[in-house]
């Protein structure tokens, strides 16, 4: 045996040169069906390699890019108007940065640095329209926006607190027998949903929900699938379904809750004539209805039939044992799986009204067909079957491929590295103190239902292209804890450091007693990102862009 021959061969790193990759693409067609993957690799050569710290911006709250990358929306400082900007491209400020070397333009006081920070925003974003949206004391929710599939319109939400005096009438608060009891943690408000044309800045349509509770933050209470918009009224336990037209108007489709069909009131009136009489005279009090709401009734019927199909007396006894608890369940969250199916999360009223924040509370997931008004399936929040469906078909829950024919959703069902992260998280919970398999399932299913348009499609967050610490930044568009060091992005194929993103200010003493949050907004496909660090009431905006340091 020759001991001089090494048995461990060093890993060969593929050529990272962009010229080499372009030439290889020219002479090699690659495997069938891999064209888009080969093109996407070029993002490892063109990336946001330069950060400008503390960019001056107009007095507004930055929100996000449209899915086609053409527009950027922001909310005015008084949260009554929507500001629509046109994005000018990642090269828009290259002449301003000419001659700058390195990776960071820090918060310096020299004249050129101050000039760059003051002009950078207007170079990248040109203001097109300012649309006055909220009226009657309402304020736009800074974390609520939904873009239509054609990127022509955007839907935003506003709310106004109800005054303590005069108090709303009792039957305005409780409009049916499923209505929940409001409390200071979950106060009632007046809500409005507005749809604005991005091209013209015109306010096209508005829908109002008086004396209600709709969770606007992070789009939790509303969901847009293609042209179908669903809105969950937590207070009235009702789901309102609209169709969004290409012209930007809302068309009433159906209301699900007390009734499932639009003509159910006629059926009830045939049996209870006083219901029809009270409705015509305006004296109807659905809160005192003696019968179970239609949607809840369909849920109970499904569970009873499942107990009958089980064939055992124990299954029926368990149904009777928990019947009262099942009747007290309330809708908390929902999402559209497609144009016809709703995915609804039920839990106790204390959780829905935020009296209890214990995540271990029992809950149920219901799949409901809006057209046939049938409950298709019911899962507990400890269901291994639902977890398997979620892990294998995560993209269908995210609806990640609606805006483009070619997208690369970075989820556990379509990305090996995302799957590894999820398995590592699952194993951590299983092995933790007071953990276990059931607790891990409950924690993973706690992500459902998934809010609409809450994941970034940026290639720089694709775990198959880049490796980064998802503790500081991830594809899910939620604020993260701001770290003390830059976020490093390594090429997945070579392991080489490609670029760093620095959030917050540099050179300032760090107070670890104050929680610092940072929100990232990535362009859908260009090497450009915005980070907004919030510490108490202070906002620091950094731009991360492509800069040729020559």
From Swiss-Prot:
The keyword Repeat does not apply. Highly expressed in the ovary, some lymphoid organs and resting leukocytes. GO terms for biological process: positive regulation of proteasomal ubiquitin-dependent protein catabolic process; protein ubiquitination; protein-containing complex assembly. GO terms for molecular function: protein-containing complex binding; ubiquitin protein ligase binding; ubiquitin-like ligase-substrate adaptor activity. The keyword Magnesium does not apply. Keywords: Nucleus, Ubl conjugation pathway. GO terms for cellular component: Cul4-RING E3 ubiquitin ligase complex; Cul4A-RING E3 ubiquitin ligase complex; cullin-RING ubiquitin ligase complex; nucleus. It is found in: Nucleus. Component of the E3 ubiquitin ligase DCX DET1-COP1 complex, which is required for ubiquitination and subsequent degradation of target proteins. The complex is involved in JUN ubiquitination and degradation. PANTHER family: DET1 HOMOLOG, DET1 HOMOLOG DE-ETIOLATED-1 HOMOLOG. Belongs to the DET1 family. Component of the DCX DET1-COP1 ubiquitin ligase complex at least composed of RBX1, DET1, DDB1, CUL4A and COP1. This is DET1 homolog. It comes from Homo sapiens.
